[in-house]
Amino acid sequence: MSLDTVALNQRMTHFDGHAEVWLFGYGSLIFKADFPFLARRPASIAGWSRRFWQGSMDHRGTQEAPGRVVTLESDALATCHGMAYLVTPEEFAHLDHREKNGYLRLPVTITFDDASTAEGMVYIATADNAAYLGEASEADIARHIAGAAGPSGPNRDYLLALAQALRELGRPDAHVFEIERHLVALAG
């Protein structure tokens, strides 16, 4: 699949005709909402694990030295916690551009903290996209992150901001926190 997924996402019609759509964020969308939204609520999606397996050549790395950012991996026993935003379809163009580095819009059932649910969408970078880096140990991922930077800043800032946002939500993530632990140890 192409690295730039904007055109693919613009052809998706699942939410055509909707005046508003819930968007589930599990990475930088938790702590950096640079788009207008009608509502924001802590939420989760079942059957997915957050993993630092996606390369970032556009935000937290470069073509020559990609950073690592999160995507979701199918995991029947897992629940991924994050933040849901109610947005209008007019925001899709901005979001598609922001998530262009291999992420596709997919429909998902979002569960809010009060146990109510809504159909919504999530951006997921699947293993068949050109920027996918794949599985590595948390220690190796931390070393990779420590040396990467891109137009949006050092890759380490992304990891640390995500870990802090998850703490503020009261939703620990063992994978994220273990990478953070290794990164802090590397910094000495």
Feature names for model-found ranges:
Residues 1-188:
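A glycine-rich, hydrophobic/aromatic-adjacent loop/helix-cap motif
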